């Protein structure tokens, strides 16, 4: 096994944990199965992560980063605010449809953290990350498109996180991809209405 900087090894183990957890479930994923998935010894795993909490926090952060990166790449100013917002949501939705197992894992991680004593703060952190990501995207759009919001950024960010969360869960449960176009139009029109 080649030596690798610890930050890179942590990323490797985090991605392996995401694959193992998405496949086997959070509760059934062990440190051994993650090490095997990454192709490293168990001692390497324990060198990189001193607790299961640290691993789960890394998984939550990485999953959030995956989704945010997809949206950021798509969210560049277009001719209208509606087109810009629609492009961001479309990119996110394409990610959900392409990686449903990763998005299911986010809900499983939330439930696991809420039920596991001492892990509750990780569920809170997960949703704080969602709000922070939306606030950053909103601020970027506000600057780039010279927008004036009708509500504070923090309120809009939390609202968008809750709405996206609900839409994602609805899709994962019902699997109605055909309905997305109408939903996207409704969401886009509503968001545009929150801007002057």
Predicted segments with their positions:
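Short helix-capping/turn signature of helix-turn-helix
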Residues: 49, 108-115
């Amino acid at each position: 096994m080649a030596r690798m900087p610890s930050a890179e090894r942590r990323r490797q183990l985090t991605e392996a944990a995401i694959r193992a957890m998405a496949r086997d479930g959070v509760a059934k994923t062990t440190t051994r199965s993650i090490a095997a998935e990454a192709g490293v010894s168990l001692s390497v795993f324990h060198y990189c992560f001193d607790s299961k909490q640290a691993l789960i926090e890394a998984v939550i952060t990485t999953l959030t980063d995956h989704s945010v990166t997809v949206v950021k790449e798509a969210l560049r100013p277009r001719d209208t605010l509606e087109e810009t917002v629609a492009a961001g949501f479309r990119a996110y939705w394409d990610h959900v449809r392409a990686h449903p197992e990763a998005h299911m894992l986010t809900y499983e991680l939330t439930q696991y953290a809420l039920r596991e004593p001492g892990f509750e703060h990780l569920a809170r952190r997960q949703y704080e990350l969602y709000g922070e990501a939306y606030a950053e995207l909103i601020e970027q759009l506000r600057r780039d498109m010279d927008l004036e919001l009708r509500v504070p950024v923090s309120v809009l960010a939390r609202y968008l996180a809750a709405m996206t969360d609900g839409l994602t869960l609805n899709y994962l449960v019902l699997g109605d991809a055909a309905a997305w176009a109408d939903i996207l139009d409704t969401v886009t029109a509503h968001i545009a209405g929150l801007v002057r």
